[in-house]
Swiss-Prot record:
Provenance organism: Homo sapiens (Human)
Protein name as annotated: Fc receptor-like protein 6
Function: Acts as a MHC class II receptor. When stimulated on its own, does not play a role in cytokine production or the release of cytotoxic granules by NK cells and cytotoxic CD8(+) T cells. Does not act as an Fc receptor.
Span(s) of short sequence motif ITIM motif: 369-374
Any one cellular-component term (Gene Ontology): plasma membrane
GO biological process: cell surface receptor signaling pathway; immune response
Domain Ig-like C2-type residues, every copy: 20-95, 111-197, 207-293
Gene name for this UniProt entry: FCRL6
Length: 434
Protein backbone atom coordinates (compact mmCIF):
# COMPACT_ATOMS: atom_id res chain seq x y z
CA UNK A 1 0.00 0.00 0.00
CA UNK A 2 2.79 2.41 0.80
CA UNK A 3 4.57 1.56 -2.51
CA UNK A 4 1.60 2.59 -4.67
CA UNK A 5 1.29 5.82 -2.73
CA UNK A 6 4.94 6.66 -3.48
CA UNK A 7 4.46 5.98 -7.21
CA UNK A 8 1.41 8.23 -7.40
CA UNK A 9 3.30 11.02 -5.69
CA UNK A 10 6.23 10.61 -8.06
CA UNK A 11 4.29 10.79 -11.37
CA UNK A 12 3.21 14.46 -11.06
CA UNK A 13 6.79 15.42 -10.42
CA UNK A 14 7.82 13.68 -13.62
CA UNK A 15 5.40 15.77 -15.65
CA UNK A 16 6.86 19.01 -14.33
CA UNK A 17 10.54 18.08 -14.82
CA UNK A 18 12.52 18.60 -18.13
CA UNK A 19 14.08 15.23 -18.51
CA UNK A 20 15.68 15.70 -21.99
CA UNK A 21 17.51 18.55 -23.68
CA UNK A 22 19.41 18.86 -26.97
CA UNK A 23 22.90 20.31 -27.39
CA UNK A 24 24.73 21.35 -30.62
CA UNK A 25 28.41 22.14 -30.87
CA UNK A 26 30.57 23.93 -31.65
CA UNK A 27 28.78 27.09 -30.77
CA UNK A 28 28.65 29.22 -32.85
CA UNK A 29 28.70 26.92 -35.84
CA UNK A 30 30.46 28.02 -39.03
CA UNK A 31 30.47 26.51 -42.46
CA UNK A 32 32.80 23.56 -42.58
CA UNK A 33 32.66 22.88 -38.86
CA UNK A 34 31.90 19.34 -37.77
CA UNK A 35 28.35 19.69 -36.41
CA UNK A 36 27.43 17.32 -33.59
CA UNK A 37 24.03 16.86 -31.87
CA UNK A 38 23.69 15.29 -28.40
CA UNK A 39 20.44 14.25 -26.72
CA UNK A 40 21.08 14.23 -22.97
CA UNK A 41 18.90 13.17 -20.03
CA UNK A 42 18.37 15.15 -16.86
CA UNK A 43 21.28 14.45 -14.55
CA UNK A 44 22.67 12.03 -17.15
CA UNK A 45 19.68 9.77 -16.88
CA UNK A 46 20.13 6.72 -19.13
CA UNK A 47 18.28 6.92 -22.45
CA UNK A 48 17.28 4.42 -25.08
CA UNK A 49 15.40 4.50 -28.36
CA UNK A 50 16.75 7.99 -29.18
CA UNK A 51 15.27 9.85 -32.16
CA UNK A 52 16.43 13.15 -33.69
CA UNK A 53 14.23 15.64 -35.54
CA UNK A 54 14.83 18.73 -37.64
CA UNK A 55 12.02 21.20 -38.22
CA UNK A 56 9.60 18.56 -36.90
CA UNK A 57 10.70 15.88 -39.34
CA UNK A 58 12.35 12.63 -38.37
CA UNK A 59 16.08 12.75 -38.95
CA UNK A 60 17.82 9.79 -37.26
CA UNK A 61 17.21 6.87 -34.85
CA UNK A 62 19.65 5.15 -32.46
CA UNK A 63 18.90 2.50 -29.86
CA UNK A 64 21.71 3.36 -27.48
CA UNK A 65 23.80 6.22 -28.86
CA UNK A 66 22.75 9.64 -27.65
CA UNK A 67 25.09 11.53 -30.07
CA UNK A 68 24.53 12.26 -33.78
CA UNK A 69 27.36 13.51 -36.06
CA UNK A 70 26.03 15.77 -38.83
CA UNK A 71 29.35 16.11 -40.72
CA UNK A 72 30.57 19.41 -42.12
CA UNK A 73 28.04 22.10 -41.49
CA UNK A 74 26.62 24.04 -44.40
CA UNK A 75 24.13 26.82 -44.73
CA UNK A 76 21.52 24.14 -45.41
CA UNK A 77 22.24 22.68 -41.97
CA UNK A 78 20.31 25.48 -40.30
CA UNK A 79 17.07 24.57 -38.54
CA UNK A 80 15.22 23.71 -35.34
CA UNK A 81 16.38 20.43 -33.81
CA UNK A 82 14.89 18.22 -31.11
CA UNK A 83 15.18 14.68 -29.78
CA UNK A 84 13.13 12.08 -27.94
CA UNK A 85 13.95 8.93 -25.95
CA UNK A 86 12.86 6.49 -23.27
CA UNK A 87 13.81 7.52 -19.77
CA UNK A 88 14.20 4.69 -17.26
CA UNK A 89 12.93 5.34 -13.73
CA UNK A 90 12.57 2.60 -11.26
CA UNK A 91 10.25 0.83 -11.37
CA UNK A 92 8.97 2.15 -14.81
CA UNK A 93 10.15 3.51 -18.19
CA UNK A 94 8.47 6.36 -20.10
CA UNK A 95 9.17 8.40 -23.28
CA UNK A 96 10.19 12.06 -23.15
CA UNK A 97 10.83 14.74 -25.84
CA UNK A 98 13.27 17.61 -25.55
CA UNK A 99 12.57 21.21 -26.31
CA UNK A 100 13.65 22.49 -29.74
CA UNK A 101 17.04 24.09 -30.18
CA UNK A 102 17.77 26.54 -32.98
CA UNK A 103 21.01 25.81 -34.81
CA UNK A 104 22.48 28.76 -36.75
CA UNK A 105 25.30 28.04 -39.20
CA UNK A 106 27.40 31.14 -39.84
CA UNK A 107 28.80 31.84 -43.29
CA UNK A 108 32.57 31.53 -43.21
CA UNK A 109 33.00 33.83 -46.21
CA UNK A 110 30.64 34.98 -48.98
CA UNK A 111 30.91 33.55 -52.51
CA UNK A 112 33.82 35.22 -54.32
CA UNK A 113 33.39 37.74 -57.10
CA UNK A 114 35.70 37.68 -60.12
CA UNK A 115 36.52 40.95 -61.87
CA UNK A 116 38.76 41.92 -64.79
CA UNK A 117 41.00 44.98 -64.62
CA UNK A 118 40.90 47.35 -66.45
CA UNK A 119 37.89 45.91 -68.27
CA UNK A 120 36.33 42.56 -69.24
CA UNK A 121 36.65 43.81 -72.84
CA UNK A 122 40.34 44.75 -73.06
CA UNK A 123 42.13 45.68 -76.25
CA UNK A 124 44.42 43.17 -77.87
CA UNK A 125 47.95 43.37 -76.49
CA UNK A 126 47.00 45.01 -73.20
CA UNK A 127 47.59 43.66 -69.68
CA UNK A 128 44.55 42.05 -68.03
CA UNK A 129 44.36 41.24 -64.32
CA UNK A 130 41.74 38.84 -62.94
CA UNK A 131 40.94 39.49 -59.29
CA UNK A 132 39.05 37.07 -57.02
CA UNK A 133 37.55 38.86 -54.02
CA UNK A 134 35.94 37.61 -50.80
CA UNK A 135 36.27 38.16 -47.04
CA UNK A 136 36.45 35.91 -43.97
CA UNK A 137 34.06 36.24 -41.05
CA UNK A 138 35.62 38.42 -38.32
CA UNK A 139 35.45 35.53 -35.82
CA UNK A 140 37.46 33.34 -38.20
CA UNK A 141 39.80 35.95 -39.68
CA UNK A 142 42.85 33.90 -38.66
CA UNK A 143 42.11 31.33 -41.35
CA UNK A 144 44.03 31.35 -44.62
CA UNK A 145 42.16 31.30 -47.91
CA UNK A 146 43.43 29.65 -51.08
CA UNK A 147 42.46 30.75 -54.61
CA UNK A 148 42.34 28.96 -57.96
CA UNK A 149 41.43 30.23 -61.44
CA UNK A 150 39.68 28.42 -64.27
CA UNK A 151 38.68 29.07 -67.91
CA UNK A 152 36.33 27.08 -70.10
CA UNK A 153 36.68 23.99 -67.92
CA UNK A 154 40.48 24.19 -67.64
CA UNK A 155 42.52 25.12 -64.59
CA UNK A 156 44.75 28.12 -65.19
CA UNK A 157 46.17 28.36 -61.67
CA UNK A 158 45.94 25.81 -58.86
CA UNK A 159 45.10 26.74 -55.30
CA UNK A 160 47.42 29.32 -53.89
CA UNK A 161 47.43 32.35 -51.61
CA UNK A 162 47.36 34.89 -54.46
CA UNK A 163 43.90 36.26 -55.28
CA UNK A 164 44.98 37.64 -58.69
CA UNK A 165 45.90 36.20 -62.08
CA UNK A 166 47.70 38.31 -64.70
CA UNK A 167 47.31 37.86 -68.47
CA UNK A 168 50.09 39.84 -70.20
CA UNK A 169 49.58 40.81 -73.82
CA UNK A 170 46.01 39.60 -74.10
CA UNK A 171 45.15 37.96 -77.41
CA UNK A 172 41.86 37.20 -79.07
CA UNK A 173 42.33 33.56 -78.03
CA UNK A 174 42.22 34.64 -74.37
CA UNK A 175 38.53 35.43 -74.73
CA UNK A 176 36.25 33.05 -72.84
CA UNK A 177 34.43 32.30 -69.58
CA UNK A 178 36.50 32.64 -66.40
CA UNK A 179 35.73 31.86 -62.77
CA UNK A 180 37.62 31.39 -59.51
CA UNK A 181 37.29 29.08 -56.50
CA UNK A 182 38.10 29.86 -52.86
CA UNK A 183 38.64 27.40 -50.01
CA UNK A 184 40.13 27.76 -46.50
CA UNK A 185 43.39 25.97 -45.94
CA UNK A 186 42.65 22.51 -44.55
CA UNK A 187 38.91 23.14 -44.66
CA UNK A 188 36.12 21.51 -46.55
CA UNK A 189 34.27 24.62 -47.67
CA UNK A 190 34.74 25.53 -51.30
CA UNK A 191 32.95 28.33 -53.09
CA UNK A 192 32.93 29.29 -56.75
CA UNK A 193 32.42 32.71 -58.25
CA UNK A 194 29.92 33.45 -61.01
CA UNK A 195 31.37 33.13 -64.49
CA UNK A 196 32.89 36.22 -66.06
CA UNK A 197 33.05 36.58 -69.84
CA UNK A 198 36.24 38.19 -71.09
CA UNK A 199 36.20 39.41 -74.69
CA UNK A 200 39.55 40.62 -76.00
CA UNK A 201 38.86 43.31 -78.58
CA UNK A 202 41.01 42.80 -81.68
CA UNK A 203 41.26 45.51 -84.36
CA UNK A 204 39.67 44.78 -87.70
CA UNK A 205 41.88 43.80 -90.59
CA UNK A 206 41.69 45.56 -93.94
CA UNK A 207 38.49 44.34 -95.58
CA UNK A 208 38.33 42.86 -99.06
CA UNK A 209 35.65 44.07 -101.48
CA UNK A 210 34.33 41.78 -104.21
CA UNK A 211 32.00 42.78 -107.06
CA UNK A 212 29.54 40.16 -108.35
CA UNK A 213 27.63 40.61 -111.60
CA UNK A 214 27.27 38.87 -114.95
CA UNK A 215 30.20 37.68 -117.07
CA UNK A 216 30.22 41.02 -118.92
CA UNK A 217 30.00 44.58 -117.69
CA UNK A 218 26.53 45.23 -116.26
CA UNK A 219 24.03 47.44 -118.05
CA UNK A 220 21.22 49.60 -116.74
CA UNK A 221 18.68 47.33 -115.05
CA UNK A 222 21.16 44.60 -114.07
CA UNK A 223 21.80 43.61 -110.44
CA UNK A 224 25.18 44.11 -108.79
CA UNK A 225 26.25 42.59 -105.47
CA UNK A 226 29.03 43.97 -103.27
CA UNK A 227 30.65 41.59 -100.76
CA UNK A 228 32.80 43.00 -97.95
CA UNK A 229 34.73 40.84 -95.48
CA UNK A 230 37.29 41.53 -92.77
CA UNK A 231 39.29 38.38 -92.04
CA UNK A 232 39.76 39.25 -88.36
CA UNK A 233 38.43 41.67 -85.80
CA UNK A 234 36.23 41.45 -82.74
CA UNK A 235 32.50 41.62 -83.42
CA UNK A 236 30.22 43.38 -83.80
CA UNK A 237 31.57 44.89 -87.03
CA UNK A 238 29.85 47.69 -88.93
CA UNK A 239 30.36 47.57 -92.70
CA UNK A 240 29.82 50.68 -94.85
CA UNK A 241 29.82 50.82 -98.66
CA UNK A 242 31.01 53.84 -100.65
CA UNK A 243 30.80 55.03 -104.25
CA UNK A 244 33.45 57.67 -104.96
CA UNK A 245 33.62 58.60 -101.23
CA UNK A 246 29.82 58.84 -100.97
CA UNK A 247 28.15 56.30 -98.67
CA UNK A 248 25.56 54.13 -100.39
CA UNK A 249 24.68 51.68 -97.60
CA UNK A 250 25.79 49.97 -94.39
CA UNK A 251 25.17 46.71 -92.56
CA UNK A 252 26.07 45.38 -89.11
CA UNK A 253 27.59 41.94 -88.56
CA UNK A 254 26.94 41.00 -84.88
CA UNK A 255 29.13 37.92 -85.18
CA UNK A 256 31.59 39.26 -87.72
CA UNK A 257 32.10 37.59 -91.08
CA UNK A 258 30.89 38.77 -94.50
CA UNK A 259 28.15 41.21 -95.37
CA UNK A 260 26.75 42.19 -98.76
CA UNK A 261 24.92 44.98 -100.56
CA UNK A 262 22.65 44.16 -103.52
CA UNK A 263 21.38 46.95 -105.78
CA UNK A 264 20.09 47.46 -109.34
CA UNK A 265 21.99 49.63 -111.81
CA UNK A 266 19.75 52.63 -112.49
CA UNK A 267 21.97 54.90 -114.58
CA UNK A 268 25.56 55.60 -115.58
CA UNK A 269 25.96 57.41 -112.28
CA UNK A 270 26.12 53.97 -110.62
CA UNK A 271 29.46 53.39 -112.34
CA UNK A 272 32.62 54.39 -110.53
CA UNK A 273 34.99 53.30 -107.78
CA UNK A 274 33.40 51.28 -104.99
CA UNK A 275 34.98 50.57 -101.60
CA UNK A 276 33.89 49.29 -98.20
CA UNK A 277 34.85 50.11 -94.63
CA UNK A 278 34.94 47.83 -91.57
CA UNK A 279 34.70 49.33 -88.08
CA UNK A 280 34.53 47.92 -84.56
CA UNK A 281 35.17 49.31 -81.09
CA UNK A 282 38.94 49.25 -81.64
CA UNK A 283 39.73 50.37 -85.18
CA UNK A 284 38.46 51.24 -88.65
CA UNK A 285 39.85 50.06 -92.01
CA UNK A 286 39.00 50.82 -95.66
CA UNK A 287 39.30 48.35 -98.55
CA UNK A 288 41.01 48.88 -101.88
CA UNK A 289 38.61 50.51 -104.38
CA UNK A 290 37.09 48.38 -107.13
CA UNK A 291 36.01 49.97 -110.41
CA UNK A 292 32.56 49.20 -111.78
CA UNK A 293 32.17 49.85 -115.52
CA UNK A 294 28.85 49.82 -117.31
CA UNK A 295 28.24 48.35 -120.74
CA UNK A 296 28.39 51.08 -123.39
CA UNK A 297 29.20 53.89 -120.97
CA UNK A 298 31.53 56.58 -122.27
CA UNK A 299 32.31 58.47 -119.09
CA UNK A 300 32.74 56.94 -115.65
CA UNK A 301 32.47 59.07 -112.60
CA UNK A 302 35.69 57.96 -110.98
CA UNK A 303 38.21 59.78 -108.85
CA UNK A 304 40.73 59.38 -111.71
CA UNK A 305 38.92 62.19 -113.64
CA UNK A 306 39.63 64.61 -110.86
CA UNK A 307 42.99 65.48 -112.44
CA UNK A 308 41.10 67.84 -114.76
CA UNK A 309 40.05 70.07 -111.91
CA UNK A 310 43.47 71.62 -111.13
CA UNK A 311 44.11 72.28 -114.87
CA UNK A 312 40.83 74.08 -115.45
CA UNK A 313 41.91 77.42 -113.90
CA UNK A 314 45.25 77.24 -115.75
CA UNK A 315 43.45 76.65 -119.05
CA UNK A 316 41.14 79.60 -118.46
CA UNK A 317 44.12 81.77 -117.56
CA UNK A 318 45.89 80.76 -120.78
CA UNK A 319 42.84 81.65 -122.84
CA UNK A 320 42.64 85.02 -121.13
CA UNK A 321 46.32 85.72 -121.90
CA UNK A 322 45.82 84.83 -125.57
CA UNK A 323 42.72 87.02 -125.78
CA UNK A 324 44.58 89.93 -124.19
CA UNK A 325 47.49 89.54 -126.64
CA UNK A 326 45.10 89.53 -129.59
CA UNK A 327 43.36 92.61 -128.23
CA UNK A 328 46.68 94.48 -127.87
CA UNK A 329 47.69 93.43 -131.38
CA UNK A 330 44.41 94.61 -132.90
CA UNK A 331 44.56 97.92 -131.08
CA UNK A 332 48.16 98.55 -132.22
CA UNK A 333 47.19 97.60 -135.77
CA UNK A 334 44.33 100.06 -135.72
CA UNK A 335 46.62 102.85 -134.43
CA UNK A 336 48.85 102.31 -137.47
CA UNK A 337 46.13 103.81 -139.70
CA UNK A 338 43.32 102.55 -141.88
CA UNK A 339 44.06 100.53 -144.97
CA UNK A 340 43.09 101.98 -148.36
CA UNK A 341 39.67 101.24 -149.60
CA UNK A 342 39.45 97.90 -151.28
CA UNK A 343 38.43 97.82 -154.87
CA UNK A 344 35.90 95.24 -155.97
CA UNK A 345 36.74 93.05 -158.92
CA UNK A 346 36.07 94.50 -162.33
CA UNK A 347 33.27 93.32 -164.44
CA UNK A 348 34.19 90.85 -167.13
CA UNK A 349 35.41 92.48 -170.29
CA UNK A 350 35.94 95.87 -168.66
CA UNK A 351 39.05 97.96 -169.21
CA UNK A 352 41.38 98.41 -166.33
CA UNK A 353 43.86 101.11 -165.40
CA UNK A 354 46.44 101.26 -162.65
CA UNK A 355 45.61 103.13 -159.50
CA UNK A 356 48.24 104.37 -157.10
CA UNK A 357 47.40 105.33 -153.58
CA UNK A 358 49.83 106.73 -151.02
CA UNK A 359 48.98 106.99 -147.34
CA UNK A 360 51.28 108.97 -145.11
CA UNK A 361 51.11 108.36 -141.38
CA UNK A 362 53.38 110.12 -138.89
CA UNK A 363 53.78 108.36 -135.57
CA UNK A 364 56.02 110.99 -134.02
CA UNK A 365 57.87 114.16 -134.72
CA UNK A 366 60.85 112.54 -136.37
CA UNK A 367 59.46 109.63 -138.31
CA UNK A 368 56.72 108.77 -140.73
CA UNK A 369 55.53 105.87 -142.88
CA UNK A 370 54.13 105.97 -146.42
CA UNK A 371 51.95 103.08 -147.62
CA UNK A 372 51.64 102.69 -151.42
CA UNK A 373 49.07 100.47 -153.09
CA UNK A 374 48.46 99.99 -156.80
CA UNK A 375 45.04 98.94 -158.10
CA UNK A 376 43.56 98.61 -161.52
CA UNK A 377 40.09 99.95 -162.15
CA UNK A 378 37.84 100.89 -165.01
CA UNK A 379 35.07 103.30 -165.71
CA UNK A 380 32.51 100.54 -165.63
CA UNK A 381 33.20 100.05 -161.95
CA UNK A 382 32.14 103.59 -161.13
CA UNK A 383 28.52 102.62 -161.19
CA UNK A 384 29.19 100.06 -158.48
CA UNK A 385 31.36 102.33 -156.34
CA UNK A 386 28.54 102.64 -153.82
CA UNK A 387 28.77 98.90 -153.14
CA UNK A 388 32.38 99.09 -151.98
CA UNK A 389 32.73 97.82 -148.42
CA UNK A 390 35.60 97.18 -146.12
CA UNK A 391 34.58 93.53 -145.78
CA UNK A 392 35.25 92.72 -149.48
CA UNK A 393 38.44 90.72 -150.02
CA UNK A 394 38.41 90.11 -153.79
CA UNK A 395 40.16 93.37 -154.95
CA UNK A 396 43.21 92.85 -157.14
CA UNK A 397 46.33 94.42 -155.66
CA UNK A 398 49.05 94.88 -158.26
CA UNK A 399 51.86 96.01 -155.95
CA UNK A 400 52.41 97.50 -152.56
CA UNK A 401 55.30 99.47 -151.15
CA UNK A 402 56.13 100.69 -147.68
CA UNK A 403 58.63 103.52 -147.47
CA UNK A 404 59.80 105.47 -144.41
CA UNK A 405 60.08 109.25 -144.78
CA UNK A 406 62.75 111.40 -143.26
CA UNK A 407 61.79 114.47 -141.28
CA UNK A 408 62.92 116.68 -144.17
CA UNK A 409 60.44 114.95 -146.46
CA UNK A 410 57.45 115.48 -144.20
CA UNK A 411 56.14 119.00 -143.88
CA UNK A 412 53.18 118.34 -141.60
CA UNK A 413 51.42 115.63 -139.64
CA UNK A 414 48.53 115.48 -141.97
CA UNK A 415 47.99 112.46 -144.09
CA UNK A 416 48.62 113.18 -147.80
CA UNK A 417 47.13 110.80 -150.26
CA UNK A 418 47.24 111.13 -154.00
CA UNK A 419 46.69 108.97 -156.99
CA UNK A 420 48.01 109.06 -160.44
CA UNK A 421 47.42 107.15 -163.58
CA UNK A 422 49.87 105.47 -165.89
CA UNK A 423 51.76 107.65 -168.30
CA UNK A 424 50.20 105.86 -171.24
CA UNK A 425 46.96 107.59 -172.23
CA UNK A 426 43.96 105.30 -171.90
CA UNK A 427 40.61 106.39 -173.16
CA UNK A 428 38.60 104.53 -170.57
CA UNK A 429 40.82 105.36 -167.56
CA UNK A 430 40.52 108.33 -165.35
CA UNK A 431 42.12 109.60 -162.21
CA UNK A 432 40.58 108.31 -159.00
CA UNK A 433 41.15 109.95 -155.64
CA UNK A 434 41.13 107.68 -152.59
Amino acid sequence: MLLWTAVLLFVPCVGKTVWLYLQAWPNPVFEGDALTLRCQGWKNTPLSQVKFYRDGKFLHFSKENQTLSMGAATVQSRGQYSCSGQVMYIPQTFTQTSETAMVQVQELFPPPVLSAIPSPEPREGSLVTLRCQTKLHPLRSALRLLFSFHKDGHTLQDRGPHPELCIPGAKEGDSGLYWCEVAPEGGQVQKQSPQLEVRVQAPVSRPVLTLHHGPADPAVGDMVQLLCEAQRGSPPILYSFYLDEKIVGNHSAPCGGTTSLLFPVKSEQDAGNYSCEAENSVSRERSEPKKLSLKGSQVLFTPASNWLVPWLPASLLGLMVIAAALLVYVRSWRKAGPLPSQIPPTAPGGEQCPLYANVHHQKGKDEGVVYSVVHRTSKRSEARSAEFTVGRKDSSIICAEVRCLQPSEVSSTEVNMRSRTLQEPLSDCEEVLC
